[in-house]
């Protein structure tokens, strides 16, 4: 399985890198993708990460899952990216995997793809998970079908 981790300036470094590390240890292929037109993406704490791919060089036919790390203003940049929104909607239509952490599930809520699905997010972001069954008692790792 190939996972594309979407990075935008202001992403939360630990949310991106810890997930990437766990996925790689589980033998997933993980590619970092800068949604901007630059390879180095600055995290919320100004740590620069060199992305494997930039948006224009990304082939989503090679991807099985899109993962969105949270962080501010990174989550807002993800929300504002029209191309990413289109890819997320297409993945949802195809029943492909979509994952997000902390504030980033709000991107899915804004696209209306959480209707009738269980979701969890950073406290205070529940109002952005439009249509979701908010389940704060879920564990940190949850798979909902």
Regions found by a protein language model. Give the residues of each.
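Extreme N-terminal starter segment of soluble prokaryotic enzymes
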Residues: 1-4
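Short N-terminal binding/cap micro-motifs at the start of the first secondary-structure element
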Residues: 11-16, 40
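Hydrophobic residues within alpha-helices
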Residues: 18-19, 87
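A short, Lys/Arg-enriched amphipathic alpha-helix followed by its capping loop at the start of a domain
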Residues: 19-28
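Flexible gly/pro-rich beta->alpha loop and the following alpha-helix that scaffold active-site loops
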Residues: 31-96
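Catalytic nucleophile loop
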Residues: 66-70, 88-114, 122
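A conserved active-site-flanking secondary-structure segment within enzyme catalytic domains
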Residues: 114-137
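Conserved small/polar residues in nucleotide/adenosyl-binding loops
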Residues: 141-145
